[in-house]
């Protein structure tokens, strides 16, 4: 991921000496982010990759401080948080392809924060339609040939992933796509239905069933997030009536990736 950021945006990530910058857990690694062109300081990146007792599940990105200049230059403090499993007994740490794509996804959010430049932090921000685009688009680089040849190697032989296997993985990307699309889209539509009610429903389960019935939801497919555990909607207002942005972002990131591929260089800095 750091290699990708360097090629696309000219960022360097340098480990900060242990203990020189406070972290919120011993597992957290801190990196200083600088511009390759002039060595100027961009911010700090906190990498919290491993699961532990008391840590919430899933993966997420956090911006503790955004860039601003209204009261002197304030640089970015950003973190990525994953739940990878630590290896035991000196074994190498292995992650799945899905984990690797998640890592690049969350790193895209961090790159978005690190690239932002505005005077007043209160006037910064991202339209909900766009907020998942910077994360989802960076997932495409996981299977790019330079990343595969440099980093995605067999743990025992050191050989990079063969292109024949990459082709099969990419071909499998459309498997069950109809199911996945309906699962995602039903969650987005029920979200919109819920947030356009003049009177909030008191029986959320009954509302969900009625909403899905109006949509003609196939019985064989379930929502990606049932309403009782739809954290995107209820842990904050961030995604209220906005869960559709994940699907809309897929449209934008597919178009972007096609543009990179058509240029003949998926690390084309002029496009980035």
Regions found by a protein language model. Name each.
Residues 1-272:
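Cation-handling catalytic/transport regions enriched in His/Asp/Glu
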């Amino acid at each position: 991921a750091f290699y990708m950021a360097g090629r696309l945006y000219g960022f360097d990530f340098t480990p900060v000496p242990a203990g020189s910058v406070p972290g919120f857990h011993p597992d957290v690694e801190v990196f200083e982010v600088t511009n390759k062109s002039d060595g100027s300081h961009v911010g700090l990146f906190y990498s919290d990759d491993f699961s532990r007792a008391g840590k919430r599940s899933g993966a997420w990105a956090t911006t503790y401080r955004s860039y601003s200049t209204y009261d002197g230059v304030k640089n970015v403090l950003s973190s990525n948080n994953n739940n990878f499993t630590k290896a035991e007994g000196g074994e190498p740490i292995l992650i799945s392809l899905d984990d690797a794509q998640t890592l690049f996804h969350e790193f895209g959010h961090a790159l978005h924060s690190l690239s932002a430049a505005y005077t007043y932090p209160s006037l910064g921000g991202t339209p909900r339609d766009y907020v998942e685009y910077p994360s989802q688009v960076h997932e495409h680089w996981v299977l790019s040939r330079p990343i595969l040849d440099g980093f995605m190697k067999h743990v025992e032989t050191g050989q990079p992933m063969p292109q024949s296997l990459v082709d099969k993985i990419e071909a499998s990307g459309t498997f069950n796509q109809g199911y996945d699309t309906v699962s995602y889209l039903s969650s987005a539509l029920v979200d919109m239905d819920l947030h356009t009610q003049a009177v909030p429903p008191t029986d959320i389960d009954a509302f969900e069933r009625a909403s899905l019935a109006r949509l003609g939801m196939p019985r064989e497919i379930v929502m990606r997030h049932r309403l009782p555990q739809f954290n995107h909607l209820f842990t904050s207002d961030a995604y209220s009536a906005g869960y559709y942005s994940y699907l809309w972002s897929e449209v934008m990131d597919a178009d972007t990736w096609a543009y990179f591929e058509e240029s003949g260089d998926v690390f084309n800095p002029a496009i980035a």
